[in-house]
From Swiss-Prot:
Similarity remark: Belongs to the polyribonucleotide nucleotidyltransferase family.
HAMAP family the record matches: PNPase (MF_01595)
Summary of the function given for this chain in its UniProt record: Involved in mRNA degradation. Catalyzes the phosphorolysis of single-stranded polyribonucleotides processively in the 3'- to 5'-direction.
Protein name per its UniProtKB record: Polyribonucleotide nucleotidyltransferase
Predominant location: cytoplasm
Length: 702
C-alpha cells in the first residue's frame, strides 16, 4: 500500500499520523509524531484464530523507550536495553486499560501492541503520543475494536485553570498531573495525582480532557477511512440460552443464597461445591448435555447476573452492607519494634502491613531515564503474596500489577510529604498485603500515611484512600463504597480516590462499559469523600499528626552550610579528609556544590562528632577571640601556634609577655598548649596572635 499521512491540530500541538512506510507486515502500524518533539512507532498484530484453551482475552501491550531516541547509549556491561523499567511498565498499563474494554465480548484472538519511542526531545512524556498511535494502529488494522480512543494529559493551576498536554516544565508548576482516555461518548480511564484539589476541580479536569481529545478521535476516524484495512469477518459466539436456562432453573436460587455468605473463603467453598454440582448435572456427551468448559463459563455468567441484579434491586451487598458503608476498620501503629515506622491497617478482609524506613541521601533511587539520570528520594513498594488470598503461587520479583498498585499508593501520599530541604531523608515505604478482599492499594495508602507519621516524617496532613464500584443495568445504577474483590470483578467501574480532609491527592478510574454519565461520576466522588472523611476520622483517633521525634532506630541527620571555597578543605586531597572523618566518626557526609552539607549518623553522637570536625576545618579565626592552641614551630622572631585545623597564627616575640623576652624558647616549647588572642587577619589570611593580651581580654569578658 502507498504511505498515508494525516496531520491535525491537538490543542497547541501538531500531530502527524503515518502508515504504509514502516512495519508493513504488522496488522496495523502507525508512526506518530507530536510537534517534532516525540516520535513513536506503534504496531498492532492480531492472531487470525483464537486459542480455545485460553479462557481470557490475551491482549498484551509493550511500551519501550529506546535510548537512541534521546541520543544516548545504554549503560551496563552489555550496552543494550534490558528488562522494562518501572516507567515503561506503568505506561504499558496506561495504554492497556482504555483499549481492553473496547474489544468485543467473546473475542479471544491474541492481540499484541508494541509502542517504541524512536525519537524524543526530552521535553514531553511520550505516553500520550503512544496512546494516540495505539488508537490509530488499531483503527487501521481491521481487528474488531469499538474505538477509536482519544487521550490527553491535563495540568491545573489555580490562576490559569486547566492546561492541555503540558510539557515537563509546565507540570512542575502544576497542582495536577492527569491522563484521561476514552471514546467519543465516554471516559474509560483516568490516572492522576494532585495537590489536594476539590472533587469539582478533578471532575472538571476529566470533562475538559474528554472534550479536548475529540479532535484526536475525529482525526483517527478520517485516517482509518483513508488507510484502514477491511474489518475482520468475526462473529461473537451466540449465548447458549438452553444451558443458561437450565442452570438458572435448577441452581439459580442456590447461587443467589451462596452470595449471602459474608465470609469470603466460606462463600468461595460453597460456590465451588455448586459449580461441581452443575458440571455433574449438565456436562457430558449425551442428549441434553454440554461441554464442561461451556458449563463453567455459563455458571460464571449466572454468578455475574445474580450479583449485579441483587445490587441494582437494592438488596444487601455480598457481605450484607448497603451501598455507602465502609467495612469495619482496625488500625494499629508502631507494631514492629526495630523498624523506623510501622502500621497494620485492616479493612474487613483486606489487610496491609506497612513499614517506613528512613535513609541517607545516598540511599535515593537512581533512575536512568531518557531525560537523563535522576534521583528519587521517595519509594513506595507494594507486595501482593499469594497467601493474601489463600492460594499457593509464584514468588519472585514485582509483577506489572504490583508496580501499578505501588505507584497509585505513592501518588496518594507523595503530595503530603515534606520538601527535601525540610526533611532531607530518603524514604522507603513497603506495603505487604497480608489479606486481600478488594481495595488493597487504598489500604496501602492509609497504611503508608500511618507508618510515615509513626516514623516522625512531618506529613502535611494524613491521607486515606477508598475504592468505589458501579453496577449499571439499563436505567438503574448503584455506586458502591469500599468494594470487595468480587464486586470489582463483577462490576462496571473501578474508581479509586485518595486524599486528605481538604482535597484529592490521587484519582484512578477504570470503566469497563460505555454510558458512565457525569451524574454517576459526581455521585461516586461525593460518596468517596464521605467514606474518606470517615476513614480519616478513625485514623486520627490512633495517630493524628506525625511524631515529634524520629524513631531511635532511624539515622540522625544534621544539616549545615559552608562557604563554597571551603569545600575542598573538607574533602581533602583525593578525598582523604572526608574519608577520615567518616571512618573515625562512623557517619556519612554528603556535600553539594553550593556548600550544603548533610551529615547522617547511625546515632546522634556520631552525627554530632562529624559536624564538629567539619566546623573545625571550615571555621575562620575571629578577631578578638581567645583560642587554645598548640605551639607548632618556634623561630627567632616568634612562634607559630595552631588554633584551628589547618590554621596557624604567628605570636611575635614582642607579644609573648609584658616582660622583655630574649629567646622565644625561654617562654615556649614546641607542642605546648597556650591561650592566644587573635589580633588581626590580613587580606592574605595570615593570622596575628598575642599571648600577653589574653589576661586583659579575659578580664574584659571576651
Amino acid at each position: 500500500m502507498n504511505p498515508v499521512i494525516k496531520q491535525f491540530k491537538f490543542g497547541q500541538s501538531t500531530v502527524t499520523l503515518e502508515t504504509g512506510r514502516i512495519a508493513r507486515q504488522a496488522s496495523g502500524a502507525v508512526l506518530v509524531t507530536v510537534d517534532n518533539d516525540v516520535t513513536v512507532l506503534v504496531t498492532v498484530v492480531g492472531a487470525k484464530t483464537a486459542d480455545p484453551s485460553k479462557g481470557f482475552f490475551p491482549l498484551s501491550v509493550h511500551y519501550q523507550e529506546k535510548t537512541y531516541a534521546a541520543g544516548k547509549i545504554p549503560g551496563g556491561f552489555f550496552k543494550r536495553e534490558g528488562r522494562p523499567s518501572e516507567k515503561e511498565t506503568l505506561t504499558s498499563r496506561l495504554i492497556d486499560r482504555p483499549i481492553r474494554p473496547l474489544f468485543p465480548e467473546g473475542f479471544m484472538n491474541e492481540v499484541q501492541v508494541v509502542c517504541t519511542v524512536v525519537s524524543t526531545s526530552k521535553k514531553t512524556d511520550p505516553d500520550i503520543a503512544s496512546m494516540i498511535g495505539t488508537s490509530a494502529a488499531l483503527a487501521v488494522s481491521g481487528i474488531p475494536f469499538n474505538g477509536p480512543i482519544g487521550a490527553a494529559r491535563v495540568a491545573f493551576h489555580p490562576d490559569t485553570g486547566y492546561l492541555l498536554n503540558p510539557n515537563y516544565e509546565q507540570l512542575k508548576a502544576s497542582s495536577l498531573d492527569m491522563v484521561v482516555a476514552g471514546t467519543e461518548t465516554a471516559v474509560l480511564m483516568v490516572e492522576s495525582e494532585a495537590d489536594e484539589l476539590t472533587e469539582d476541580q478533578m471532575l472538571g479536569a476529566v470533562l475538559f480532557a474528554h472534550q479536548e481529545f475529540q479532535a484526536v478521535i475525529q482525526a483517527v476516524k478520517e485516517f482509518a477511512a483513508e488507510a484502514g484495512k477491511p474489518t475482520w469477518n468475526w462473529q461473537a459466539p451466540a449465548a447458549n440460552t438452553p444451558l443458561l436456562d437450565a442452570i438458572r432453573s435448577q441452581f439459580g436460587e442456590a447461587i443467589s443464597q451462596a452470595y449471602t455468605i459474608t465470609i469470603k473463603q466460606d462463600r468461595y467453598n460453597r460456590l465451588d461445591e455448586l459449580r461441581e454440582q452443575v458440571i455433574a448435572a449438565l456436562a457430558g456427551e449425551g442428549e441434553g448435555k454440554f461441554a464442561a468448559d461451556e458449563v463453567k463459563a455459563a455458571f460464571g455468567e449466572i454468578e455475574y447476573r445474580t450479583v449485579r441484579q441483587n445490587i441494582v434491586d437494592g438488596k444487601p451487598r455480598i457481605d450484607g452492607r448497603d451501598t455507602r458503608t465502609v467495612r469495619p476498620l482496625k488500625i494499629e501503629v508502631g507494631v514492629l519494634d526495630k523498624t523506623h515506622g510501622s502500621a497494620l491497617f485492616t479493612r474487613g478482609e483486606t489487610q496491609a502491613l506497612v513499614v517506613a524506613t528512613l535513609g541517607t541521601a545516598r540511599d535515593a533511587q537512581l533512575l536512568d531515564t531518557l531525560e537523563g539520570e535522576k534521583k528519587d528520594p521517595f519509594m513506595l513498594h507494594y507486595n501482593f503474596p499469594p497467601f493474601s488470598v489463600g492460594e499457593c503461587g509464584r514468588m519472585g520479583g514485582a509483577g506489572r500489577r504490583e508496580i501499578g498498585h505501588g505507584r497509585l499508593a505513592r501518588r496518594g501520599v507523595a503530595a503530603m510529604l515534606p520538601k527535601d530541604d525540610e526533611f532531607p531523608y530518603t524514604i522507603r515505604v513497603v506495603s505487604e498485603i497480608t489479606e486481600s478482599n478488594g481495595s488493597s492499594s487504598m489500604a496501602s495508602v492509609c497504611g503508608a500515611s500511618l507508618a510515615l507519621m509513626d516514623a516522625g516524617v512531618p506529613m502535611k496532613a494524613p491521607v486515606a484512600g477508598i475504592a468505589m464500584g458501579l453496577v449499571l443495568e439499563g436505567e438503574k445504577f448503584a455506586v458502591l463504597t469500599d468494594i470487595l474483590g468480587d464486586e470489582d470483578h463483577l462490576g462496571d467501574m473501578d474508581f479509586k480516590v485518595a486524599g486528605t480532609a481538604k482535597g484529592v491527592t490521587a484519582l484512578q478510574m477504570d470503566i469497563k462499559i460505555q454510558g458512565i454519565t457525569e451524574e454517576i461520576m459526581e455521585q461516586a466522588l461525593e460518596q468517596a469523600l464521605e467514606a474518606r472523611l470517615n476513614i480519616l476520622g478513625q485514623m486520627n483517633q490512633v495517630i493524628s499528626q506525625s511524631r515529634t521525634e524520629l524513631s531511635a532506630n532511624a539515622p540522625t541527620m544534621l544539616a549545615m552550610k559552608i562557604d563554597q571555597d571551603k569545600i575542598r578543605d573538607v574533602i581533602g586531597k583525593g578525598g582523604a579528609t572526608i574519608r577520615a572523618i567518616c571512618e573515625e566518626t562512623k557517619a556519612s557526609i554528603d556535600i553539594e556544590d553550593d556548600g550544603s552539607i548533610k551529615i547522617f549518623g547511625e546515632t546522634k553522637d556520631a552525627a554530632e562528632a562529624a559536624k564538629q570536625r567539619v566546623l573545625a576545618i571550615t571555621a575562620e579565626a575571629e578577631i578578638g577571640k581567645i583560642y587554645v592552641g598548640k605551639v607548632e614551630r618556634i623561630v627567632d622572631f616568634g612562634a607559630f601556634v595552631n588554633i584551628l585545623p589547618g590554621k596557624d597564627g604567628l605570636v611575635h616575640i614582642s607579644m609573648l609577655s609584658d616582660q622583655r623576652v630574649e629567646k622565644v624558647t625561654d617562654v615556649l616549647k614546641e607542642g605546648q598548649e597556650v591561650k592566644v588572642l587573635v589580633l588581626d587577619v590580613d587580606n592574605r589570611g595570615r593570622i596575628k596572635l598575642s599571648i600577653k593580651d589574653v589576661a586583659a581580654a579575659e578580664a574584659s569578658g571576651v
